[in-house]
C-alpha cells in the first residue's frame, strides 16, 4: 500500500517523477543518472545504458564529493534528479555548522557551473515537473503555503491559495485533476480529468464517469493518454492495489479498456506497445513486515510482459529471475531499464515460524535489467554504487 500511495501523491503533486522517457534536450542521452556512493559519499552517478558501466558524474577521479571539495554533485538527494532545457536540477542536503541545510540546485553542463535556486526549510510536499520546482507546506502559523520556482527564469513565485496546479502538459494545454469525491482517498482519486490553459481555465473534460488514480501524462503518444482506475470492493471502498488501465484519445474523447488486471504496477510505453512487470498468482514470501504485522511478497515474479494498447494482445517478453521493482522504470536512448532488488533469504531469521528480515542487516543486491526492445537482447547490471545494499 505504501508504494501505491506514493504513486497517488505523484498525481496530486506532479508527474510521476521516476518513470518516463528522458528529456529530449538532455546532454546525458546515453545515461541513467541516479544518486549513489563514491569515495564513501553520496553523489550523482551515471549508468551507461549501452555498456552497463557505472561512474561518478563528477569528472575529478580524486574528488571526495563533500561540501568542502568543490564537487558540483555532493549531497544529492535520492529521487530528486530532474533534467530540463539541457540543464540538470536536483535537491542537495547536507550537514553544516548551522545544522542540516537543503537547497534546489541548477547545474549547467555546458560551462560546468551551478547555482542555488531555492533554500528549503521544513518539510511538505515538493518535487520537479513542467519546468518548475513545486512546494506546498504549512508555516509556523498553520497557514498553507504553495510556491514554485521557475527553473528557466530562476524566479520564485508564491501561488494563490485557489491556484489549480496542472499535472501534465499536452501541446500548449495542461492536464488538471477533477477533485470532487471526498471520503476514502478523496484527495488522491479524481472524477475524470480535464485540459485547460496555464491559468486553469478548463476547455474539455474526459472520463467523468470514471474514478481515476493516476493519469500518465508523461506517456502520451499519437494523442493517446493512459490512466489507472482502481476497482471498487464489495464494501464500496476503492482498492489501490487492484486497478484497471484505460486509454483515451484526446482528439475524439474515445475511451477503451487496455488491461483489466494491471494491479498497481507502472509501465513503459513505446508507441502502441507497453512493457510492465505484472503481478503473479501465489507470489513467494519475501519476509514478514513487523510494522504492518503481515507477510511481504514479491508480486512481480521477475517476468516482463508487453501488450498492444489497441488490440489488448499480451505476451511474455522476458524472464529475468530478479525481484523487479514494478514502479521504477526508465526509457533512455531506446533502452528499457527495469530496476530490481534481490534479497539473500539465507539472512532471514525464523521467529514464530515467520521469515523476519533484520533491517539494515540482511543482504540485498540492487541493479537493472537493461533491454533493447528491438531484438529482446539485454544486459544485467549490478548497482555497485548503491547506497542501500548490504552485500
Where are each of the predicted segments found?
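C-terminal motif of bacterial Sec signal peptides marking the signal peptidase cleavage site
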Residues: 15-18
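Residue position within the beta-strands of beta-propeller blades
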Residues: 33-36, 89-92, 133-137, 175-177, ...
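An edge-strand/N-cap motif at the start of beta-rich repeat modules
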Residues: 20-56
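Positively charged n-region of N-terminal signal peptides that target proteins for export
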Residues: 1-4
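Surface-exposed loop/turn elements that mediate protein-protein interactions on large endomembrane-trafficking
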Residues: 43-65, 99-119, 141-161, 184-208, ...
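Repetitive helical segments and hydrophobic/amphipathic motifs
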Residues: 11-12
Amino acid at each position: 500500500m505504501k508504494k501505491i500511495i506514493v504513486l497517488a501523491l505523484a498525481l496530486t503533486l506532479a508527474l510521476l517523477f521516476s518513470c518516463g522517457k528522458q528529456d529530449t534536450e538532455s546532454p546525458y542521452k546515453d545515461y541513467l543518472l541516479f544518486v549513489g556512493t563514491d569515495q564513501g559519499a553520496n553523489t550523482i552517478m551515471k549508468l551507461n545504458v549501452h555498456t552497463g558501466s557505472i561512474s561518478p558524474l563528477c569528472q575529478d577521479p580524486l574528488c571526495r564529493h563533500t561540501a568542502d571539495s568543490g564537487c558540483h554533485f555532493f549531497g544529492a538527494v535520492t529521487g530528486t534528479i530532474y533534467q530540463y532545457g539541457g540543464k540538470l536540477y536536483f535537491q542537495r542536503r547536507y550537514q553544516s555548522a548551522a545544522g542540516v541545510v537543503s537547497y534546489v540546485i541548477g547545474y549547467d553542463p555546458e560551462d560546468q557551473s551551478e547555482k542555488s535556486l531555492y533554500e528549503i526549510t521544513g518539510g511538505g510536499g515538493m518535487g520537479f515537473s513542467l519546468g518548475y520546482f513545486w512546494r506546498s507546506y504549512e508555516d509556523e502559523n498553520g497557514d498553507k503555503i504553495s510556491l514554485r520556482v521557475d527553473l528557466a527564469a530562476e524566479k520564485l513565485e508564491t501561488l494563490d491559495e485557489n491556484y489549480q496546479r496542472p499535472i501534465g502538459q499536452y501541446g500548449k494545454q495542461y492536464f488538471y485533476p477533477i477533485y470532487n469525491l471526498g471520503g476514502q482517498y478523496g484527495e488522491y482519486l479524481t472524477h475524470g480529468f480535464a485540459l485547460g490553459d496555464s491559468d486553469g481555465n478548463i476547455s474539455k473534460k474526459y472520463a467523468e464517469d470514471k474514478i481515476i488514480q493516476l493519469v500518465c501524462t508523461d506517456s502520451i503518444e499519437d494523442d493517446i493518454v493512459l490512466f489507472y482506475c482502481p476497482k471498487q470492493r464489495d464494501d464500496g471502498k476503492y482498492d489501490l492495489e487492484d486497478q484497471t488501465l484505460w486509454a483515451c484519445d484526446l482528439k475524439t474523447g474515445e475511451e477503451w479498456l487496455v488491461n483489466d488486471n494491471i494491479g498497481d504496477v507502472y509501465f513503459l510505453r513505446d508507441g502502441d506497445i507497453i512493457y510492465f512487470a505484472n503481478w503473479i498468482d501465489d507470489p513467494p514470501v519475501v519476509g514478514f513486515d513487523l510494522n504492518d504485522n503481515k507477510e511481504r511478497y514479491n508480486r512481480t515474479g521477475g517476468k516482463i510482459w508487453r501488450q498492444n494498447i489497441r488490440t489488448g494482445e499480451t505476451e511474455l517478453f522476458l524472464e529475468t529471475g530478479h525481484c523487479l521493482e514494478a514502479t521504477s522504470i526508465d526509457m533512455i536512448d531506446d533502452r528499457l531499464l527495469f530496476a530490481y532488488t534481490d534479497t539473500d533469504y539465507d539472512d532471514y531469521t525464523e521467529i514464530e515460524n515467520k521469515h523476519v528480515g533484520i533491517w539494515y542487516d540482511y543482504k540485498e543486491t540492487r541493479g537493472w535489467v537493461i533491454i533493447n526492445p528491438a531484438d529482446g537482447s539485454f544486459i544485467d547490471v549490478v548497482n555497485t554504487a548503491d547506497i542501500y545494499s548490504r552485500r
